[in-house]
Amino acid sequence: MYLQNANESLVVVLTAAKDTLDCSIVCDINDHDASGMITPQVAAQASTNGTTEVTITTGGADKNRQVARLTLYNNDTDIINAVFSKKISGTLYGIVKVQLQPGATAVYSKDGA
């Protein structure tokens, strides 16, 4: 997935209140400009905030941002449901909804692995 400018972002929200702990998020990012991929690669870390939307990463004004890998770990003691969306100028475009048992991890990779 690419975020093509500063008006595009990747967001997550839980569909119900957490029991005790928010989920951990790690997002590995490849940035690209007119010359190609910018190195070194970067990572963004975040935590869910209950039923409040959380921005994981946002595109740049002069670069494309590629989400290379994304993990969501359920730190909670109960099952969680999380919805990931691409947000463009305030409009949400649903990507995926995942349900995780306590201690489980959801993984997205641009390579499909």
Regions inferred by a protein language model and the residue ranges of each:
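Surface-exposed, low-hydrophobicity beta-strand/loop segments enriched in small/polar/acidic residues
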Residues: 1-113
